[in-house]
Amino acid sequence: MDILTKYFSDFTETQLQQFAALKDLYVEWNQKINVISRKDIDNFYEHHVLHCLAIATQFEFKKGSEVMDLGSGGGFPGVPLAIFFPETQFHLVDSINKKLNVATEIATAIGLQNISVQHTRAEDIKNRKFDMVVTRAVAPLKDLWRWSKPLLKKGVAPNGLVCLKGGDLAKEIFESNCRPRVWEVDKIFTEPFFKEKFMLHVPN
């Protein structure tokens, strides 16, 4: 938990309480449904919460804007971002319903009211548009952009697709035919875990 306040100093008391409650809730649910690698749970705040909040260091989601978390699983990056941006609506989408149920239960337990969930695939969503799409370690950029582009509103800022990814992305970016802006996450957060972690933004 201290690692969050190392980088973010202006949380409200409510946000601090919500972040503080996350680990025990995820540990409890992880014993029933595996949403986080067992070996990662001791580094929960660094590897999962702080990693997701890399997005918040570069993007300011506006009050009332709608953000889709594509392939959210148990709620990453959607749940940490929903705590960080309480006036932004986050729509968590995943094809595995039991993982979404974990995100729903945890959001309810900490009093998050700006989260909705949908058990579906992104390509099956119709008649719904979002200001931005966020995702973490879900699929190749080519597929993420193909699924996201039809769901993005036009003429809003910030907009587009934001992905958290790791490893050598040169081939993946080339094959996507996208020209994303790329941030090295270890230039944002200095912990060794973030080496070779990247954040990509494809504007709409």
Kindly label every feature range from the protein language model:
Residues 1-62, 68, 98-115:
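Class I SAM-dependent transferase core
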Residues 26, 165, 202:
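Residue-level signal for inorganic ion chemistry
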Residues 53-135:
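Conserved SAM/SAH cofactor-binding pocket of Class I
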Residues 85, 152-157:
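Helix-to-beta-strand junctions that scaffold the AdoMet/dcAdoMet cofactor pocket
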Residues 89, 114-116, 160, 181-184:
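Conserved beta-strand segments of alpha/beta enzyme cores
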Residues 131-150:
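A short SAM/SAH-binding and catalytic strip from SAM-dependent methyltransferases
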Residues 156-168:
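Conserved beta-strand signature within the Rossmann-like core of class I S-adenosyl-L-methionine
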Residues 168-204:
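Active-site capping/gating segments
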